[in-house]
Amino acid sequence: MITILQIQKQLIEAIKTSGLKQTEIAKKIGVSQQTISHYIKGDKMPSLDTLANLCVVLDIDPADILCIHNSK
């Protein structure tokens, strides 16, 4: 089962790796910087469409954010 804490950790890592500031990310996906801060703190979860946009902006596979890995 995926937890908010797992998604939060993956999101924090993706933001660090991207080198983008919260304000830049917020502008690109059409939310406030405070909203990005809430996602990072785990106070709020992004909607599915916002999460998809975050993945595009952060250049990360949604499966990584959602901690979904195929083991074949």
Question: Where are the model-predicted features located?
Answer:
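Short, charged recognition helix plus adjacent turn
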Residues: 1-2, 19, 38, 66-72
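Residue-level detection of the helix-turn-helix DNA-binding "recognition helix"
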Residues: 16, 30, 41-43, 52, ...
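Residue-level signal for the short linker/turn that defines the boundary of a DNA-recognition helix
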Residues: 20, 46-49
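DNA major-groove recognition helix of helix-turn-helix/homeodomain DNA-binding modules
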Residues: 49-64
